Amino acid sequence: MYYGFDIGGTKIALGVFDSTRRLQWEKRVPTPHASYSAFLDAVCELVAEADQRFGVKGSVGIGIPGMPETEDGTLYAANVPAASGKPLRADLSARLDRDVRLDNDANCFALSEAWDDEFTQYPLVMGLILGTGVGGGLVLNGKPITGQSYITGEFGHMRLPVDALTLMGFDFPLRRCGCGQMGCIENYLSGRGFAWLYQHYYDQSLQAPEIIALWEQGDEQAHAHVERYLDLLAVCLGNILTIVDPDLLVIGGGLSNFTAITTQLAERLPRHLLPVARAPRIERARHGDAGGMRGAAFLHLTD
């Protein structure tokens, strides 16, 4: 059995998957905030319960919103303070007496989608998250590509390309990102960025769902905004896809629920790619809230 943990700031979610990659059981508990010991106990107790329930010693994979900084799995995880700066992988491997695998939640999202029954036919899968921020991951032949610093797929921290400024205007403001750089595409393509662009052009403060509702009602201003956003997304993806050249692009995060993104993006991409390039198949993520658990569990499918 494959145990996958999706760990966030508020909850620890465990999903147990069988050899056919089907979810057999799941359980959630609150994430301890103050005590590393309590955090380890919470994970270990869930593993013990799963072992007892299924009568096996399952493999353990963990997806967490942070970046392992060393080989022992020491984390930088601002949203999970109890575990940040701690050798999480090494400590859990010792306590559970098994190989614990650890990756960031965006890579687990991409891995979950790459192992979808239909998507396993594609050698190179790119996962793109358009949510509170912009992130993602790359999976090659069923294995996540992490890089030496675990930042492969941090697409949101690429800078606006010159074609974006041609589209938006060379006086378009380059906003400072939380990472400290200027002009990161996360500030324009995330859910927050979607709303910021609307306010920038129309001087109205609306959230993304409100703007999308107006678009669905046929509002001309919302329609113009969505067209501009999709053009900007295509421009920015042009650089990324030229570097990565994936077979499949899977889009997740809150904005993936807006169908125009997956249905209207493909037609905009070719003019931003090399003439010989083929645009990837574009699909909306299929596994929703279970994606983090799935991807973490499937870290052990990559042997």
From Swiss-Prot:
Annotated GO biological process: N-acetylglucosamine metabolic process; peptidoglycan turnover
- Top-level lineage group: Bacteria
Tell me which SUPFAM superfamilies the record gives. Actin-like ATPase domain (SSF53067)
UniProt family annotation: Belongs to the ROK (NagC/XylR) family. NagK subfamily.
Record-given protein name: N-acetyl-D-glucosamine kinase
Q: Which UniProt keywords apply?
A: ATP-binding, Carbohydrate metabolism, Kinase, Metal-binding, Nucleotide-binding, Transferase, Zinc
GO molecular function terms noted in the UniProt entry: ATP binding; N-acetylglucosamine kinase activity; zinc ion binding
